[in-house]
Amino acid sequence: RGLGDVYKRQDDMRPTPEMSFAIRHLGCQSGIILTASHNPKEYNGYKAYWDDGAQVLAPHDAGIIDEVNNIASAADIKFQGNPDLIQIIGEDIDKIYLDMVKTVSIDPEAIARHKDMKIVYTPIHGTGMMLIPRALKMWGFENVFTVPEQMIKDGNFPTVISPNPENAEALSMAVN
């Protein structure tokens, strides 16, 4: 199903892996995720995904860019789908996704033995805040701490230069 047939959107921020799951679970032809990923705010934009939930690759990527380059104005874009087919993705998909995630735990017994292990989590203002704390609780972890200043949705990433967790600076608030 393409945009002309069915349009599905999320009612709030969601992590990229959940969107990839939703594309496959709902049988969508493709999906678009508005994101900066783990890059600085200058990279805010979108990623296009195909029906397998993976990012669009060649040759489809070039075809999409060609179509985008043919648009002179946003006013030229016309939605030609049936509004009755619009479905908002929200808590229902969250539940299905988290139920699926729970089944892929490598060692549930190890988690049970170490459920009081101290875990510090920060989404660095990103979408992980929507599901990671819930997933950790669902798995049984009891000693989870978050970084409150970075649990605020903000695509400007005000507490870091870059939200890339590969940079030590991005995790300094969590470590301290």
Spans of model-derived segments:
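Short, high-confidence coil segments that cap the C-terminus of an alpha-helix
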Residues: 27-29
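Short, small-residue-biased leader/transition segments that mark boundaries at the very start
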Residues: 2-7
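Short acidic loop-to-helix transition motifs that present clustered carboxylates
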Residues: 11-19, 150-154, 169-173
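Gly/Ser/Thr-rich loops at beta-strand to alpha-helix junctions
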Residues: 1, 14, 39, 123-129
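Gly/Ser/Thr-enriched, mixed-charge loops and adjacent short helices
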Residues: 44-170
